[in-house]
């Protein structure tokens, strides 16, 4: 079998595109490029420094940093030294979360940014196996076992001055397809997350697979706005672009995490990317900002914008096969006019060169997809998971259908199975099971979970879906299906998305039914919107009358989905919440209720609010006008 490691991929691109800009970074007033050949020089220097430090083939190194050139160069340098990267999320705030990963992964060396160093220092005494902590930024002083990256580079120069280059390169070239590249810990899956082992060939295979769905050329640029520890950001964010000689930028690092987030829209506009990776939470924020900008122009602008959207929705239909076809062709002049008057100006806020978004992390609401498509910057939904490196399918310029997760990457085998593992015919819903070179090597030091998840080369994803007309439709977690008292199973995610999307006074919501007499919901209200509604009736949330009316407002918004409501055709009544619990605080990363992609961690929410769920199945709790809901408001 031909050897195709990440090092091979990188060396091939440097050879073909030496003068192309590879990495872009903004530390001052503008983004500055570093070419492929220059990045290679820096990688050699740093990799040789790691070897000089004592890093050996098979050692595990952790990387904890904001997105920046040093992150990508650092990972490549690890590979040239023969090491495996354990990328860590900067959103890990709890010392125990970091400590578990570092100890569980047998980490010997840590690369860390100056901003994140305090987290390592807080647990350093509990990490006796860690030999050195390499700080990516220059500090006034360093503590025990700490050293600056500049010293590693100095050591690398000395090493390369003494040893033949071929001797150093032989270390990286000794890596094979099955050697480990990363051990990633997807957040929010269990109390002690599993370490997903991805090999060099897992990554290069998924790059090849993804390029069967999306075309990229060497002039393209992307700004990676997702955390680099995600394998989604790894594959689509820089390895696909690297394979094509294209350019990768990272968001300007602020003094705080919030400042870095605020830099995202500014950086997008100035860097002018061709493609951006997104997750639903970011997509919703972008949409919210666009709508706020339109409202700021006055009521006439809002009416015109909404009219333009409606016409765009009709013209585009639900897929590329419907777009502009049949009677829709009559709308083309209007679509072009509105695009010139309105949507082109919106696109300028994304730099003016953006071709499309690729969405991952969680399912994108269908209405959200239609919104961006009407603007002329499609947000194509893809599907994958860390254990598949991660891409399994995606919509794209070649083919898209709103609501689907697109066509399968190639080559890849997929089957849909029932709960007993029997293969189901096309169109029937069951667990998505895949086989291909992108399937992980296993879970680190967890053979039992590996055996449960990968069977004879087939990865059991734990997600529910079906195939239709060559497209994959993902319905949600197979293992988080709600089960009615009659044994009927249904996926909650689509219902939850719709309830939040169409209910202005509900910010977050999860459904619950575990063979219970009826479905219930735990929800986080939008108190600001409730106050505005109440103000029209001279009420507020401080009075009993105001709180009772607020609960009625939420109930009415849910009732829109019931028989007689304007959204009644979307879901069966029995799947909708009979009653609901209003929660006193939102689901956040800080309280552990959402993961780093802003996806609600159902198990943690259910555990934290077990008593509240039990109350919903009492006579008092079944009535939404209960004391607990009033207290929460």
Where are the regions a protein language model picked out?
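Structural core segment of the AMP-binding/adenylate-forming
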Residues: 53, 80-156, 559
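Conserved pre-ATP/AMP-binding loop-to-beta segment of ANL
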Residues: 19-21, 151-185, 192, 215-221
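Conserved ATP-binding/catalytic segment of the ANL
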Residues: 422-427, 431-484, 625-632
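Conserved AMP-binding A3 loop
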Residues: 33-37, 181-207
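ANL superfamily adenylate-forming
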Residues: 118-176, 290-343
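Conserved C-terminal "lid"/linker of ANL adenylate-forming enzymes
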Residues: 508-512, 517, 560-633
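Conserved AMP-binding/adenylation subdomain of ANL enzymes
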Residues: 204-221, 228-343
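Conserved AMP-binding/adenylate-forming core of the ANL superfamily
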Residues: 22-68, 76, 93-99, 148-153, ...
């Amino acid at each position: 079998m031909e050897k195709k490691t990440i090092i091979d991929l990188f060396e091939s691109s440097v050879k073909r595109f030496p003068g192309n800009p590879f990495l872009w970074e903004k530390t001052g007033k503008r983004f500055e490029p570093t070419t492929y050949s220059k990045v290679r020089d820096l990688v050699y220097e740093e990799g040789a420094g790691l070897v000089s430090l004592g890093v050996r083939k098979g050692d595990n190194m952790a990387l904890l940093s904001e997105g920046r050139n040093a992150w990508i160069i650092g990972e490549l340098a690890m590979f040239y030294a023969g090491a495996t990267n354990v990328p860590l999320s900067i959103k890990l705030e709890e010392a125990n979360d970091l400590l578990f990963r570092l100890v569980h992964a047998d980490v010997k060396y840590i690369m860390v940014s100056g901003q994140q160093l305090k987290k390592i220092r807080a647990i350093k005494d509990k990490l006796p196996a860690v030999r050195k902590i390499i700080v990516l930024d220059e500090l006034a002083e360093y503590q025990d076992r700490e050293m600056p990256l500049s010293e590693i580079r100095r050591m690398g120069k000395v090493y390369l001055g003494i040893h033949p280059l071929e001797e150093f390169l032989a270390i990286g070239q000794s890596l094979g397809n099955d050697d480990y590249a990363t051990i990633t810990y997807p957040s929010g899956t269990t109390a002690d997350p599993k370490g997903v082992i991805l090999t060099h060939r897992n990554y290069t295979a998924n790059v090849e697979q993804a390029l069967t769905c999306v075309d990229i050329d060497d002039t393209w640029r992307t700004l990676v706005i997702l955390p680099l520890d995600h394998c989604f950001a790894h594959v689509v964010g820089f390895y696909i672009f690297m394979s094509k000689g294209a350019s990768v930028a990272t968001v300007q690092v602020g003094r705080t995490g919030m400042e870095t987030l605020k830099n995202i829209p500014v950086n997008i506009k100035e860097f002018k990317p061709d493609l951006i990776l997104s997750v639903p939470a970011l997509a919703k924020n972008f949409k919210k900002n666009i709508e706020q900008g339109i409202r700021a122009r006055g009521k006439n602008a809002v009416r015109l914008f909404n009219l333009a959207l409606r016409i765009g929705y009709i013209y585009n239909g639900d897929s590329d096969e419907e777009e502009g076809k049949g009677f829709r062709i009559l709308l083309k002049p209007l679509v072009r006019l509105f695009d010139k008057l309105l949507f082109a100006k919106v696109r300028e806020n994304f730099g003016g060169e953006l071709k499309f978004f690729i969405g991952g992390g969680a399912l994108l609401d269908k209405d959200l997809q239609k919104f961006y498509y009407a603007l002329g910057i499609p947000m194509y939904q893809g599907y994958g998971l860390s254990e598949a490196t991660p891409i399994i399918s995606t919509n794209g310029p070649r083919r898209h259908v709103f609501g689907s997760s697109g066509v399968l990457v190639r080559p890849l085998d997929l089957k849909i199975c029932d709960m007993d593992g029997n293969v189901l015919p096309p169109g029937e819903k069951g667990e998505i099971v895949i086989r291909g070179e992108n399937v992980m090597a296993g879970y680190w030091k967890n053979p039992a979970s590996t055996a449960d998840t990968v069977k004879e080369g087939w990865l059991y994803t734990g997600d529910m879906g079906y195939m239709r007309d060559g497209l994959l439709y993902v319905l949600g977690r197979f293992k988080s299906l709600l089960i009615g008292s009659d044994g009927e199973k249904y996926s909650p995610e689509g219902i939850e998305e719709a309830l939040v999307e169409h209910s202005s006074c509900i910010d977050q919501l999860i459904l619950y039914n575990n063979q219970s007499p009826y479905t219930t919901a735990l929800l986080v209200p939008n108190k600001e919107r409730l106050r505005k509604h109440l103000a029209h009736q001279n009420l507020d949330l401080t009075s009993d009358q105001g709180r009772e009316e607020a609960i009625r407002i939420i109930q009415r918004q849910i009732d829109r989905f019931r028989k007689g409501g304007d959204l009644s055709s979307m879901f069966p009544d029995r799947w909708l919440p009979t009653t609901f619990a209003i929660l006193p605080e939102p689901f956040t990363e800080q309280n552990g209720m959402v993961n780093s992609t802003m996806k609600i961690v159902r198990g943690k929410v259910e555990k934290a609010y077990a008593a509240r769920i039990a109350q919903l199945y009492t006579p008092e709790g079944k009535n939404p006008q209960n004391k607990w809901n009033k207290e929460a408001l």
